[in-house]
């Protein structure tokens, strides 16, 4: 019997501005790293199902954190946040692979790829939906031949049943393909989506991430223990983050509850003046020693002032996006200078 601990989407290096202070943003980064370390230290051999990093390239300190987590793992699957989808780009995950970490990623961007390790099958992030689907079908065909009558599982990093999510930076597993894959596999485990759920009577398991990165993905979080023999699979999950304990809604103007241990606080209600809301928000921060983010969802004079910047899609020009992606790297200053020259 082999034992594996499954976890996904630690998003090491995440930086949040909305709903945070400079100090709490750093604390959130540390919380994400700590959650990943704890998950990787679970029973048996640990496996990360993607998005070890929040961005494909990272400062040295973040890469060191990724090395500490990946070095504890049996395998680390490449997710969409880990990949650049451009030939010749060396990502942080590539760097870890060069340093000896067990990374599963496509050898090139133009061919389907799966990896098998006994009963475990992996399909990492691909550059297109077409390649991704072919890789899954190839894995199923291989398992059907080599694992017929014996236990096997498939591990992916993608959305489930979101047909619009088929671009190069996000992929999809449809129910129709899942049903076909389940002819060869006992279970399918998915990284990528941050809230846990199951499909096909529990045989398709969406793990959910290890720790909330913002208000958008708050839910109970779990790690999963997988016990595999030649002919039997046992799965259990352990709660590693509790929404009831770590999240709270607070009514504006009312006496504050005990906020010790609460990491995410949503301030709700209505007010006549914005100044009063600002004062109350400050009071919340002062009485929440463990807060990582406090959101203002109070409406003032009928106009919502909720700050959901981190969770809303942002439309930006190419130069702004490149600057944001390079922020914190050695290329940021160089790009800024080149952009100024082109503008002139």
Q: What is each residue range found by the language model?
A:
Residues 1-65, 135, 140-150, 334, ...:
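N-terminal active-site segment of His-dependent metallophosphoesterases
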Residues 5, 119-121, 224:
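Conserved beta-strand elements of the Class I
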Residues 6, 48, 76, 154, ...:
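Structural beta-sheet core signal
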Residues 42, 73, 100-102, 148, ...:
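Structural alpha-beta junctions
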Residues 45, 54-204:
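His/Asp/Glu-rich metal-coordinating catalytic cores
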Residues 52-54, 80-84, 211-212, 270-272:
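Short histidine/acidic/glycine/proline-rich micro-motifs that form metal-
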Residues 187, 191-253:
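A conserved active-site cap/scaffold subdomain adjacent to cofactor or substrate pockets
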Residues 228-344:
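Accessory, non-catalytic peripheral segments of nucleic-acid enzymes
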């Amino acid at each position: 019997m082999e034992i594996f601990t499954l976890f996904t989407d630690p998003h090491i290096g995440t930086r949040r501005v909305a709903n945070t202070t400079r100090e709490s943003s750093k604390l959130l980064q540390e919380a994400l790293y700590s959650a990943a370390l704890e998950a990787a230290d679970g029973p048996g051999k640990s496996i990360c199902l993607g998005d070890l990093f929040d961005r494909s390239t990272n400062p040295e300190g973040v890469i060191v954190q990724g090395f500490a987590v990946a070095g504890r793992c049996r395998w680390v699957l490449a997710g969409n946040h880990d990949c650049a989808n451009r030939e010749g780009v060396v990502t942080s995950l590539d760097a870890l692979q060069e340093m000896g970490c067990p990374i599963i990623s496509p050898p090139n961007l133009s061919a389907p790829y799966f990896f098998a390790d006994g009963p475990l099958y992996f399909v990492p992030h691909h550059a297109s939906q077409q390649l991704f689907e072919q890789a899954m079908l190839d894995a199923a065909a291989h398992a059907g031949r080599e694992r017929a009558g014996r236990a096997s599982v498939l591990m992916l990093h993608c959305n489930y049943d979101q047909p619009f999510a088929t671009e190069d930076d996000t992929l999809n597993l449809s129910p129709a393909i899942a049903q076909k894959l389940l002819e060869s596999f006992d279970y399918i485990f998915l990284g990528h989506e941050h809230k846990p759920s199951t499909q096909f009577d529990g045989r398709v398991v969406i793990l959910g991430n290890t720790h909330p990165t913002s208000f958008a993905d708050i839910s109970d979080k779990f790690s999963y223990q997988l016990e595999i023999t030649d002919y039997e699979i046992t799965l259990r999950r352990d709660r590693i983050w509790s929404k009831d304990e770590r999240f709270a809604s607070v009514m504006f103007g009312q006496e504050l509850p005990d906020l010790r241990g609460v990491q995410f606080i949503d301030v709700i209600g209505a007010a006549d003046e914005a100044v009063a809301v600002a004062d109350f928000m400050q009071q919340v921060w002062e009485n929440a020693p463990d807060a990582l983010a406090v959101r203002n969802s109070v409406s003032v004079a009928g106009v919502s002032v909720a700050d959901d910047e981190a969770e809303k899609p942002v439309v930006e020009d190419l130069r702004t996006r490149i600057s944001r992606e390079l922020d914190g790297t050695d290329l940021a200053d160089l790009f800024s200078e080149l952009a100024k020259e082109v503008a002139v």
